[in-house]
Amino acid sequence: MSETHLSTQRFADLPLHPEVKQALAENGFEFCTPIQALSLPVLLQSKDIAGQAQTGTGKTMAFLVATFNHLLSTPVPEGRLINQPRAIIMAPTRELAIQIAKDAILLAKHTHLKVGIVYGGESYDVQRKVLDQGVDILIGTTGRIIDYVRQGIIGLNSIQAVVLDEADRMFDLGFIKDIRFLFRRMPEANQRLNMLFSATLSMKVQELAYDHMNEPVKVEIAPEEKTSKNIKEEIFYPSQEEKMRLLLTLIEEDWPEKAIVFSNTKHSCETLWSWLEGDGHRVGLLTGDVPQKKRIRILEQFTSGQLDILVATDVAARGLHISDVSHVYNYDLPDDCEDYVHRIGRTGRAGNKGMSISFACEEYALNLPAIESYINHSIPVSNYDSEALLADIPTPAKIHRKHPSGTRNLRDRSGASRPGAQRSGARPPRHDRTRRHS
């Protein structure tokens, strides 16, 4: 994490439980991010908060530290049953729930608190076995949590801490009725520590907070600009016929260490995957139709570096916590201005530098004025020579073909026949076909 992203507040100087401090120190957490520095002193006084913070600001660790500290510092409710968690963390997506659980496990090492996770797309029985053994902190999506509550598999009578993450996204996805259903089955708001985080504290989000929380303190880390200064943006105006060749050419020029390519439709994403796979890249596909187990595997491969490129619809634009994404390519300009911000926000995180490259083709160019108005600046335009684009591109792969476990191709574009060579780990010589780097 870049030092520019951190505050001067040390975790060691906060009145945290010794086991929480030990877990933080062992995992390299020394200084707080701004949202952590503002929210933790409030939460450690057992006061509720409604926090405004973007993804990548450290809010996950803020509410996890507060949750663990609260449970370790508060007596277990009298008469608590094994099927009653003490804390519940609600997330809008499976991917976000999984990432939160991974971070929670880091803190759980020395605390003896059990962490459980539930979400749709996985076997009920497998998740139920974990719940039957008892969990202290339950993390999950609202739909699956409600299923288990209605079946009597879990009870909410012993809840002492509640986290609602990405509350604005919960509204977007229509989950607010589910959230209110769960809140009504918990102890009264003044008997638990309540935490809400949202990218925006709109009136509807604030209404939710005041309905189900105990006079929450508003904590805001609002960026001065909607897009990070760490992200270099550029936009091209390709024809629909040249978009794919331009993308493949730019990827060769940039040779990104880790990139996400966004498109607006599942069909377009599948087409992109086919061309990138056919061109020898290590690429994964993430859309709403991908089975959950495969989604998890793809994200793990992308995170670990087994895949270099992830092609995704906006299902992946929020809730993904993947470090070191160097490039984001908007193959299609999104219809929703906020989606543009969320997409490019996958890079340039935690003080790191990032690149955002967008295409304004005939179909989606009309979205650009609204996007630029929303982000309060014009996106610099880059030009290219059509004749300089790659021409000898391999045949696209079949979408149903099993992904090879081999390595990403490292091609010598200077040869007429474009012979392939396997990636050795070293960056290839840059081919500046579009003259962007001249």
UniProtKB/Swiss-Prot annotation:
Q: Which residues form a coiled coil?
A: none
Listed GO molecular functions? ATP binding; ATP hydrolysis activity; RNA binding; RNA helicase activity
Q: What is its main location?
A: cytoplasm
Which cysteine pairs make disulfide bonds? Answer: none
Question: Where is the Helicase ATP-binding domain positioned along the sequence?
Answer: 40-219
Residue spans of biased composition, Basic residues class: 428-438
The subcellular location is:
Cytoplasm
Domain Helicase C-terminal residues, every copy: 243-390
Q: Know the name of this protein?
A: ATP-dependent RNA helicase RhlB
